[in-house]
């Protein structure tokens, strides 16, 4: 596999995360939603439970920056909540529940990328 730029690596990680979420039965509502305060990587929904799921994707090639749990700081969770609130404020549809998830994608250690899905982080 050729060396990827940070942007290419991030895009590949997000694509693998979207495929994982779709495989879990979630419907992808939007990707890379941006506002002046930041970006939400993936917004999905569980139709059966009417739950909207905001997903932060962390793509790594190794453990140099710590594991997935270290990548999701209290500040990061606060930022995700704020962004989720802003997205929800612009929607006409009501949701029964809201969930924040983090998906870690590790590329390069083996032939198949490793995906870790932490549900309900905040």
Swiss-Prot record:
SUPFAM superfamilies: Restriction endonuclease-like. Pfam families: UPF0102. InterPro entries: Restrct_endonuc-II-like, tRNA_endonuc-like_dom_sf, UPF0102_YraN-like. One of its GO terms (molecular function) is nucleic acid binding. Belongs to the UPF0102 family. This is UPF0102 protein MMAR_1812. It comes from Mycobacterium marinum (strain ATCC BAA-535 / M).
């Amino acid at each position: 596999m050729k060396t990827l730029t940070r942007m290419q690596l991030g895009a590949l990680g997000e694509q693998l995360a979207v495929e994982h979420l779709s495989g879990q039965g979630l419907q992808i509502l939007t990707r890379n939603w941006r506002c002046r305060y930041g970006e939400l990587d993936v917004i999905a929904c569980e139709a059966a439970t009417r739950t909207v799921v905001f997903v932060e994707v962390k793509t790594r090639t190794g453990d140099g920056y710590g594991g997935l749990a270290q990548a999701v700081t209290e500040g990061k969770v606060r930022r995700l909540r704020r962004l989720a609130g802003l997205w929800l404020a612009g929607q006409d549809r009501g949701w029964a529940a809201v969930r924040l998830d983090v998906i870690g994608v590790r590329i390069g250690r083996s032939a198949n990328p490793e995906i870790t899905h932490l549900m309900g982080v905040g």
